[in-house]
């Protein structure tokens, strides 16, 4: 079983500080590479919230139609989607079967994909490294196993996605203290 919720909440300040200090240059460059395409941000559970943020920020930053979708939605995409969009796979631990199936499906469809995971050693990372399915920005969350609500993973993902799109060098776009 995961951590008690009070432990998760006590960890949040350290998580925010950690996420604010991680390098996002690789993910930022990958996003910029596909700035001329729409974004199909793939996430399930808490990562779907991160996918929704990524889709919104991609639309605002580049004016490209973007959408948060579940891994199951990847299987229902029109064939032409890979011509006009790139995938972004978000997964805290990179081990859920639905996310792995979505990565495989994006590869089969020829849809370029990037992604973010909070574990540098996971089935998603190994699959992507072996097949080129996605260019992943991998981080190693220092708080260990999340509790049921995955509060720290969610907060870290949101901050990393936000920092990817809204450069810390831009005035007025700093994380609150």
Regions found by a protein language model. Name each.
Residues 33-176:
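Glycine-rich phosphate-binding loops that contact phosphosugars or nucleotide phosphates
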Residues 1-37:
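An N-terminal, well-structured beta->alpha segment
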